[in-house]
Amino acid sequence: MPELPEVEVTRRGIEPFVAGRRVERVDVRTEMLRWPVPAGLAEQLRAREVLAVERRGKYLLFEVDAGWFIVHLGMTGTLRVLPADGLPVAAKHDHIDWIFDEFVLRFRDPRRFGAVLWHPREAGDVHAHPLLASLGVEPFSPAFTGALLHARTRGRTVSVKQALLAGDMVVGVGNIYASESLFRAGIRPTTAAGKVSLPRYERLADAVRATLADAIERGGSTLRDFVGSNGESGYFQLDCFVYDRAGQPCRVCNTPIRQIVQGQRSTYFCPTCQR
């Protein structure tokens, strides 16, 4: 599933092509993704200039004068920038095309767990949308600190890894990046969130930012379906310290990496480096 780094890589790849350009038309070939594609979306966007492309958590927000169209990639979704001249014929899982003068932005989603939604400007700020309003803070924002994590986890018995994944404290720390961040911070993923000290949470906040920044720089992680807007795979997974390395020696101390299951997801950690 594309997480924050993959979505940010997509945003950065798309923005130079669409910001300041007008949508000539929209071809909707599938009316039902995770939720119904809004009726009249093509009419709403025809001849509209894209003013900006933002990211909130794992959602992409395309602003036009009349509002925002919101895209979520789901588990297998991708947005590709393709040349309008010689555009490939749409395949089975190519659901929506936003057509500009010289190129096409194509949404592909084999499993159809992604979403394309519309938020009209008269409904208020897009960040108040029901899918966005309850999200945690952005990991690169000044609001994301060790003090925030410490305060929000007092009395919580859930594991620190599961607390990171929940998304109500900080957005975008998916399974890969939670395991990697906890390794960098030296925190065992099974530790109760409420028992982690403030200094350790300060290290964890720094580790989350560093891990996500490294992943973005490397184009995200490609485990199955993800490719960036240019069709290239990410390669962060090649440099992971612990994720998907069960039984292999720790890159720091040579202890074999262990794998356990938490909340039906695989967790990887070093029993020596993480306490």
UniProtKB/Swiss-Prot annotation:
Binding site for DNA: H93, R111, R156
Pfam families reported for this sequence: Fapy_DNA_glyco, H2TH, zf-FPG_IleRS
Keywords, alphabetical: DNA damage, DNA repair, DNA-binding, Glycosidase, Hydrolase, Lyase, Metal-binding, Multifunctional enzyme, Zinc, Zinc-finger
Keyword Amino-acid biosynthesis applies: no
GO terms (BP aspect): base-excision repair
Annotated SMART domains: Fapy_DNA_glyco, H2TH
Alphabetized GO MF terms: 8-oxo-7,8-dihydroguanine DNA N-glycosylase activity; class I DNA-(apurinic or apyrimidinic site) endonuclease activity; damaged DNA binding; zinc ion binding
Family annotation (InterPro entries): DNA_glyclase/AP_lyase_DNA-bd, DNA_glyclase_Znf_dom_DNA_BS, Formamido-pyr_DNA_Glyclase, FPG_cat, MutM-like_N-ter, Ribosomal_uS13-like_H2TH, Znf_DNA_glyclase/AP_lyase, Znf_FPG/IleRS
Subunit comment: Monomer.
Family: Belongs to the FPG family.
Protein name from the UniProt record: Formamidopyrimidine-DNA glycosylase
Organism of derivation: Burkholderia lata (strain ATCC 17760 / DSM 23089 / LMG 22485 / NCIMB 9086 / R18194 / 383)
Species classification: Bacteria, Pseudomonadati, Pseudomonadota, Betaproteobacteria, Burkholderiales
